[in-house]
A protein has these predicted regions:
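Repeated scaffold domains used in trafficking and secretory/extracellular systems
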Residues: 31-32, 79-93, 122-134, 162-173, ...
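A short beta-strand motif characteristic of beta-propeller blades
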Residues: 70-84, 113-121, 152-159, 196-202, ...
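Structural motif
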Residues: 54-58, 106-108, 144-148, 183-189, ...
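Hydrophobic beta-strand positions that form the internal "hydrophobic ladder"
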Residues: 99, 136, 174-176, 217-220, ...
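Sequence/structural signature of beta-propeller modules
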Residues: 1-80, 85-87, 401
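Solenoidal tandem-repeat scaffolds enriched in leucines and small polar residues
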Residues: 184-278
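Non-cytosolic head/periplasmic domains of membrane-anchored proteins
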Residues: 117-223, 230
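Intrinsically disordered, low-complexity segments enriched in Gly and acidic/Ser/Thr residues
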Residues: 283-373
């Protein structure tokens, strides 16, 4: 077979004035088309992102729908996660993806499949549970042993040198135990993640009321109570955990301080007559007085606000729910005519458990969701993503608004 070839210079050259511009023009059109499509896509995505970020509640709702897409939910939006014996459930605490349950006779951890990850027989008279993140501490008020739990079970247990008054978990995972101690009117011991004591403070002259560790774990705050000039007052004492010398000591308020919580870089004291915000120098930076109203409940959120439930009378169902920022300013306020069984706050959300329904608000007390028929629910635990764990007599569910 014979092949013929043609030299390059024998091919027709074409019209350089016309052909070249036509080819370049086609490429420009394609590039412009892709450029416009890309720009339009970017603008749409930017608009969606801006809308979600502007409305943080909508962003959390989208995140919940993605995280719990496979969860089996009933018609109310609840996913049943845990089942347990009603006789062994007195106190509850969410523990990462698990649930800690404590009664007078048993301490348990149930994993996310409702399987028993840990179980121990105890002999408690006044059981109590406290949790933060993936760490919980169970104890008997007046007893001498604390059990520190992880989502997988027991992390460590310890016998403390005196009757336990209260115990809590700091943001860094350390455990703060307030207890009685011989020769003192109360003591605070801080334990690390393996149960070793890393700091201890004993109050020799005033009665210890409560204690807390700052969010970075570097400062211990203790509230003591004593009589000055014939009046009982609450005092704040601050220590750096790497030193045995007090940083500051100052009077906080007259009367009793019920709770002390880390708040931003300082602390918030929940007292008999108001809320007090304290810095690490012992100074009171802001206050919120109750103005003669009675304190029913208070929750200090890790989102840097406090939700306080006040009443004009010591008894009765009508209460005022108020949220307050770290400068003592009201963020929102509403009057509740229903009896409140439990109150919980986390992130930017507040959960209010009433006798007939669960209501979820944002920190400005705008109602976001309401769930009726909750008569079997004993406790509620708000989560920072806008969901809430509801613990009942024999089961616990996750409410996904």
């Amino acid at each position: 077979m014979k092949y013929t070839t043609q030299k390059l210079y024998d091919l027709p050259e074409g019209n350089r004035q016309e052909d070249a511009p036509r080819r370049v023009e086609k490429k420009k059109k394609r590039r412009r088309k892709w450029l416009w499509l890309t720009l339009l896509t970017v603008l749409i995505l930017a608009g969606v992102a801006a809308a979600l970020l502007w409305d943080a509640n909508a962003f959390d709702g989208l995140r919940r729908s993605l995280l719990y897409a496979r969860a089996e939910k009933d018609e109310t939006g609840c996913a049943k996660l845990y089942s347990y014996d009603s006789d062994e459930a007195r106190c509850f605490a969410p523990l990462g993806g698990s649930l800690a349950i404590l009664s007078e006779g048993r301490l348990q951890v149930l994993n996310e499949h409702s399987e028993v990850a840990y179980s121990a027989t105890v002999h408690f008279l006044a059981p109590a549970l406290s949790a933060n993140g993936d760490t919980a501490v169970g104890y008997d008020i007046g007893g001498d042993t604390v059990y520190v739990l992880s989502p997988l079970g027991l992390r460590w247990q310890k016998t403390v040198p005196g009757a336990v008054l209260e115990a809590s978990v700091a943001d860094n995972g350390n455990v703060v135990v307030c207890h009685e101690q011989s020769g003192h009117k109360g003591a605070v011991t801080v334990y690390d993640s393996v149960g070793e004591p890393v700091f201890a403070y004993g109050s020799a002259s005033r009665f210890l009321m409560t204690g807390a560790l700052s969010r970075d774990g570097n400062t211990l705050a203790a509230i003591t109570m004593g009589q000055e000039t014939g009046v009982f007052e609450s005092f704040l004492t601050l220590y750096r955990t790497d030193s045995d010398k007090a940083v500051a000591s100052a009077a906080v308020c007259p009367g009793i301080v019920y709770d002390l919580c880390p708040f931003d870089s300082g602390f918030c004291a929940v007292a008999e007559e108001g809320l007090y915000w304290l810095d690490r120098n012992g100074s009171t930076t802001a206050t919120y007085p109750y103005n003669g109203l009675f304190l029913r409940r208070c929750q200090v959120s890790d989102g840097n606000f406090a939700a306080v439930l006040l009443s004009r009378y010591r008894t009765g169902s009508e209460t005022d729910l108020i949220t307050v920022d770290g400068e003592g300013n009201e963020l929102g306020g509403i009057t509740l005519s229903r009896e409140v069984l439990d109150l919980s706050a986390s992130g930017r959300y507040v959960a209010v458990l009433c006798t007939d329904r669960l209501i979820i608000y944002d920190k400005f007390l705008t109602e976001l969701a309401s769930l009726p028929f909750v008569s079997q629910t004993r406790a509620v635990f708000m989560r920072s993503d806008g969901s809430a764990v509801m613990a009942g007599a024999d089961s616990a569910s996750l409410y996904l608004p």
